[in-house]
Amino acid sequence: MRRLIILAEVALGLLFASCTKEEQRTLSVIPAPLKVELQQEVFSLNSETGLYIDASEGDKKILEDYLVASSMNLKPVIAEEGHNVVLKQVAELPEVNSSEGYVLTVTPDQVLIRATSGAGLFYGVQTMLQMVDEKGLPAGVITDEPRFAYRGFMMDVSRHFFDKEFIKKQMDALAYYKLNRLHLHLTDAAGWR
């Protein structure tokens, strides 16, 4: 009788363990955004996907060069309508409290990144680049801003030499993960001569 009870408990345990919830979409972005609302649709990247940037001239040039060289193969367009990635610098963005914050909205027809500064647009682009997979970009709305104003990395170049190319790669990695300071530890001497 006791074996039967144990067998029934094991069977029930296995039965309940095999029941799963509906698969939820997760987002692998570092650092994790403040607010994520994903949907089932996808924005598909194709040869017709363009890039439209509405920002100050300096920010526009930097962002355009960066995205054209990225793995997304975007080409600049002169109108925001169409199957495009759109970056807009706006005067106000009530959803965020930081100039480095952004709102990334992805629909099946368009990707829209809004921010109040070039830095906010850049960090929105980093999130978008981390989200891209073989299917495209998952639809949804991401609202994000940094939790800390100073997000840095220290590299000790006083005790070990790093060449210029290595430091550039490190800077690209820091930007990808939205770190905004590179501290180069140049010397251990008490004075700088």
Q: Model features per residue range: what roles?
A:
Residues 1-28:
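Bacterial Sec-dependent N-terminal signal peptides
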Residues 115, 151-164:
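The substrate-binding groove and active-site-proximal loops of carbohydrate-active enzymes
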Residues 59, 161-162, 189-193:
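Flexible loop/turn segments at secondary-structure boundaries
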Residues 19-151:
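Acidic, contiguous N-terminal accessory segments
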Residues 151, 171, 184-185:
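Catalytic alpha/beta active-site cores
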Residues 162-174:
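Short, acidic/polar
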Residues 177-193:
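Aromatic-lined carbohydrate-binding/catalytic grooves of carbohydrate-active enzymes
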